[in-house]
Amino acid sequence: MTEPTVPSAGAPVDVEGEEQRPFSEHPGMARAYPGGRMTVGAITPLEGFDGPVPSLAGHMERIQQAERAGFASVWVRDVPLLDPSFGDTGQVFDPWVYLGQLTARTTSITLGTASIVMPLRHPLHTAKAAASVDQLSGGRLLLGVATGDRPVEFPAFGQDLEGRATRFRQALAYFRVVLEHRFPHVDSPLGRMAGTDLLPKPVYQRIPVLMTGHGRQDVRWIADHTDGWLYYTPPLQQQAANIARWRELTQGDGGAFKPYAQATYLDLTEDPLALPRPIHQGFSVGRVSLLGMMRTWQEIGVDQLMINFKHSRRPVADVIDELAEHVLPHFPPGRVGARGEHERPAGRAGP
């Protein structure tokens, strides 16, 4: 297998896509999803906080700490408006501006969105921003996409809430064609193009697109039109069934590996022996039981555990240090120079 390479910092920038690298060599995918084993990602902001708005104290330092600690990826949120009833504003800052900062302040960690609300943004704006981050980061971007689950946002943007599933499909198709073709002809309900092109093009043949939840789409459609699935933390048996179905639908794509990731809220307790206690979409647990849970998730086929620290009662800097010493060495990121661990190792259970 050809080894993936990150573009040289001294090379000309191929903004027109004349020398795009194969998608199979994508370094963002390689680090986040080596295949056959689980990695760990972090969802911004990396802090525990009450209420909907984080303090953002040391927010960039925590991400840099996570990169040094061995997190495979960091995921930024797209929350344009504060809805007090929803209780979460993500990292507050615009995701594309924040990712621009992250391209300059990190070196190797995969940069993801979890997720861009496609119906609320014109696909040309999304494509331009995504390709720009992709180029500036050396191909580290993974685009998590969503239909949108906050009803208050749609009328604010002049959008019909009930039509968001259709608009999502239209936006994703538009996004794909303008990034994957030169001077494309576009005739979409969202716009028309002829005789013009969108630059820059991505570093690799395409930007990986990962679906968040179902997005009011059929699972088969998700399997056919995206490169992976970001899901929540249902009971173990349900998650195993979800993954089995996902593998069934994606295993025929010419051997292409399409990862399945799980987002989980974590409150890592001071007591390393504390047994797991359910919290909102996650667990309060000591590191010993956490390690056992993570091994079980890996066995059923979870390709990445995406940790949300919002409910952490301890300083997240301390939590990251503890994970770095006792947990992350068991789930290291993929090596950018050695993608292709997609064959499940002997002894791995699950689908």
Which sequence ranges carry the predicted segments?
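Active-site-adjacent structural elements that line small-molecule/cofactor binding pockets in enzymes
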Residues: 1-351
